[in-house]
Curated annotation (Swiss-Prot):
InterPro entries: Ankyrin_rpt, Ankyrin_rpt-contain_sf. SUPFAM superfamilies: Ankyrin repeat. It comes from Acanthamoeba polyphaga mimivirus. ANK repeats lie at residues 38-70, 79-108, 109-138, 140-168, 170-198, 199-228, 229-258, 260-288, 289-318, 320-348, 350-378, 379-408, 410-438, 440-467. Gene3D superfamilies: Ankyrin repeat-containing domain. The keyword Cytoplasm does not apply. The keyword Methyltransferase does not apply. Coiled coil: none annotated. Signal peptide: none annotated. PROSITE patterns: ANK_REP_REGION (PS50297), ANK_REPEAT (PS50088). Keywords: ANK repeat, Repeat. It comes from the Viruses. This is Putative ankyrin repeat protein R911.
Length: 467
């Protein structure tokens, strides 16, 4: 049937259906490609629809010098290059070869194909590209650097055999291999002359930071300085909770008190209790920097760390009760309760705790603070105003039930709820008597300015004037 239909009819069929695959059913249909109105990239279509047999067929036609390929403009070099790179990254060697046969440039994008296939560990693709003339040294030896960073030892070895420079970019290869914990790659690079001390001992610092104990031990055995950059290694190992690395570094002479006891402060901040306990046994000072450790453990909700630090003498009321104020602000109810049980002042800094708990929508914290005597009316009803501004409906309703004045500060609550598009809050406030016309119809003007159509429509229905 295909061969009996005239070309004019096929052009109409393809234009009407939008289905370019009809052109791929018979070689003669390629002749119609320049006649149809559909602007479809044939290679894009073939690749996106996994029509590999068509790709092979196109390759054969190209090899035979068929005029369909030679004379017709159906092969887009940018598209060929795009899918060459994509398939190199996906280890599709057969497809890569067909794309190259159709004219794809293996060196497109500054030899990105060999860089990506190296980065992803596709050794056979890498070898093929190198045999076809790819430059493995492109982009400051990107290929070997990221093959190292991703732990592809065999690719690294092959690239080195082909002349790759493992020391490019300030020994980036061993830095990356250490950062990601690829011990065998690290050992191989060292055997090939990589400098583990480059960039202020980047390798051991990053291996420590990321908890790669075996890499750390190996680098130390090769002469790495664990105290570089103000004892960065032990500080960041502590910050990230890598206890075994911390212990090892301490055994090698790391100073846990460097940078104002950074190690215990950040371990506390991030909730790494075992690291904190160990550092305390080694003599760290948990009260440095105005009791930073307990303050930030509280701020981040790390209750067990908070309890331990207090047991070791941390001062919970330091810095104007920072601990309970920020635990409240961030919604950490159990921490708040514990601190209050030990004497923290929830009313410090003009009732900061309840104001910010309200503004951030932490209803259970707000309820608890009110039960403990917090004043929700301070700072001109800051609590309900900011709960309204941020759309925390449940908090608003609770505060109103406790006597908050929604009209404080020239009807701030409804103005800002409107400006920020909180329709249900606006409706609730209006039902309680909020004046939507306050400050020259501020509410509707700013709701309109910010594009909150439903709020605008509601306010207008309630008598607001949109000038």
């Amino acid at each position: 049937m295909y061969d009996t239909l005239p070309p004019e009819l096929w052009v109409q069929i393809v234009d009407y259906s939008g289905e370019i695959s009809l052109l791929l059913t018979n070689t003669s249909f390629f002749e119609l490609f320049n006649l149809i109105n559909i602007k479809t990239d044939i290679i894009e279509y073939v690749m996106e629809n996994d029509l590999i047999d068509i790709l092979k067929y196109l390759s054969l036609l190209k090899k035979l010098g068929h005029p369909i390929i030679v004379d017709k403009n159906i092969l887009n070099i940018k598209t060929l290059n795009k899918y060459l790179i994509k398939n190199c990254g996906e280890n599709q060697l057969e497809i890569v070869k067909f794309l190259v046969s159709l004219g794809a440039d293996i060196r497109a994008g500054n030899d990105y194909a060999v860089g990506l296939s190296s980065q992803n560990g596709h050794l056979e693709v890498v070898k093929y590209l190198v045999n076809q003339g790819s430059d493995i040294r492109a982009e400051n030896d990107y290929a070997v650097r990221w093959a190292s960073g991703n732990g592809h030892l065999e690719v690294v070895k092959y690239l080195v055999s082909q002349g790759a420079n493992i020391r490019a970019d300030n020994d980036h290869a061993i830095g990356l291999a250490s950062y990601y914990g690829y011990l065998e790659v690290v050992k191989y690079l060292v055997s090939q002359g990589a400098d583990i001390r480059s960039d202020n001992d980047y390798a051991v610092r990053m291996a420590s930071r990321n908890g790669h104990i075996e890499v750390v031990e190996y680098l130390v055995s090769q002469g790495a300085n664990i105290r570089s950059d103000n004892d960065y290694a032990v500080r960041l190992a502590s910050q990230n909770g890598h206890l075994e690395v911390v212990k090892y570094l301490v055994s090698q002479g790391a100073d846990i008190k460097s940078d104002n006891d950074y190690a215990v402060r950040l371990a506390s901040q991030n909730g790494h209790l075992e690291v904190v306990e160990y550092l305390v046994t080694q003599g760290t000072n948990i009260r440095v920097n105005n009791n930073y450790a307990v303050e930030w453990a509280s701020k981040n909700g790390n209750l067990e760390v908070v309890k331990y630090l207090i047991s070791q003498g941390a001062d919970i009321i330091a810095d104007n009760n920072f601990a309970v104020r920020w635990a409240s602000r961030n919604g950490h109810l159990e921490v708040v309760k514990y601190l209050v049980s030990l004497g923290a002042d929830i009313k410090s800094d003009n009732d900061y705790a309840v104001r910010w708990a309200s503004g951030n929508g932490h209803l259970e914290v707000v309820k608890y603070l009110v039960s403990q005597g917090s004043d929700i009316r301070v700072e001109n009803d800051y609590a309900v105003r900011w709960a309204s501004r941020n759309g925390h409906f449940d908090v608003i309703k609770y505060l109103v039930s406790q006597g908050a004045d929604i009209r404080s500060d020239n009807d701030y609550a409804v103005k800002w709820a409107s400006e920020n598009g909180h329709l249900e809050v606006v409706k609730f406030l209006v039902s309680l008597g909020a004046d939507i016309k306050a400050e020259d119809d501020y509410a509707v003007r700013w709701a309109s300015e910010k594009g909150h159509l439903e709020v605008v429509e509601y306010l207008v229905s309630q008598g607001a004037v949109l000038s």
